């Protein structure tokens, strides 16, 4: 078998992804950063090194599998010169190694509970890839699906490698942005950020780079979100919610000089909320919100 030179296929910024020993790898960032290509190449490279290993590739909506992750894995196989070793099945959607019988399995997670009974006849699941993670409903989707494929004990102390790829939503309070922020402190997770600026091997076309440059000039906020992968907010908040903090009691050195009440009365099944808003001598406002139980 010819030796594959991955250095020609993957930008140096992804070295930490290729060589990490952590079981979970989150790749986020802007569009055109090549992160999905990196994962597909890494998965194929690992797959051919393990004759009993299978790979599960997931998207939230099953109808998008064929023209996205299926073709992405197929692209990686062709790019690595391995196409003659595989059978590319369409129904079921599966890419099978002709010699070993192990495969890449593609599933939609329209209903996560339906995947709980999935079994793979030969070998074991060595890797799972959640593509376009921001499309998933929440962390419960991840846990239900991941638990299905990591419950089998692997030989020689191996662990299932779990990949997540996504472009961060604008909203800082979107579940995925908060989830990834939490996982940054988990020793089993590698959080990796990349952008089109990390393309040192010249994969992006001049046309693509020119388009990005125009957005950078004409719409900087959109550019930061779309191509730098920054969480810029929705742009429609009067107040920045990061400045609102829970308070156990009022400070002893700051007296309340004014208080107002407001009520949002519900109708039929809708809740009624009553708010009390205080302003102190130091021009700090405090809010107490009461909801019916």
How does the language model describe each region?
Residues 1-21:
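Pre-P-loop entry segment of helicase/translocase ATPase cores
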Residues 24-90:
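Conserved P-loop
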Residues 73-123:
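Inter-Walker segment of RecA-like/P-loop motor cores
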Residues 131-132:
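Walker B catalytic acidic pair
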Residues 135-210:
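ASCE P-loop NTPase helicase motor core
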Residues 201-266:
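ATPase catalytic-site recognition across NTP-hydrolyzing enzymes
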Residues 272-277:
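Short beta-strand scaffold segments in enzyme catalytic cores
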Residues 287-293:
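Conserved small/polar residues in nucleotide/adenosyl-binding loops
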């Amino acid at each position: 078998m010819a030796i594959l030179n991955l250095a020609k296929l993957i930008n140096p910024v992804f070295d930490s992804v290729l060589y990490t020993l952590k079981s979970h790898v989150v790749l986020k960032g802007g569009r055109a950063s090549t992160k999905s290509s990196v994962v597909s190449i890494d998965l194929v490279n690992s797959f051919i090194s393990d004759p009993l290993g299978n790979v599960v590739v997931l998207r939230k909506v099953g109808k998008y599998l064929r023209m996205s992750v299926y073709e992405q894995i197929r692209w990686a196989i062709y790019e690595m010169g391995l196409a003659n070793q595989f059978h590319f099945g369409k129904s079921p959607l599966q890419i099978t190694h002709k010699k070993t019988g192990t495969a890449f399995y593609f599933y939609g997670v329209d209903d996560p509970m339906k995947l709980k009974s999935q079994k793979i006849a030969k070998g074991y699941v060595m890797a799972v890839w959640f593509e376009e993670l921001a499309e998933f409903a929440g962390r419960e989707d991840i846990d239900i699906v991941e638990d299905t494929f990591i419950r089998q004990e692997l030989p020689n102390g191996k662990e299932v490698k779990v990949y997540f790829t996504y472009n961060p939503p604008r909203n800082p309070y979107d579940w995925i942005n908060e989830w990834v922020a939490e996982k940054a402190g988990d020793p089993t997770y590698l959080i990796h950020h990349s952008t089109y600026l990390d393309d040192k091997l010249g994969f992006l076309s001049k046309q693509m780079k020119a388009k990005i440059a125009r957005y950078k000039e004409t719409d900087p906020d959109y550019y930061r979100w779309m191509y730098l992968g920054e969480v810029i907010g929705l742009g429609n908040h009067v107040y920045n919610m990061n400045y609102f903090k829970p308070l156990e009691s009022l400070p002893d050195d700051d007296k309340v000089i004014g208080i107002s009440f407001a009520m949002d009365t519900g109708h039929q099944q809708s809740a009624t909320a009553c708010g009390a808003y205080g302003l102190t001598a130091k021009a700090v406002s405090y809010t107490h919100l009461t909801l019916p139980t």
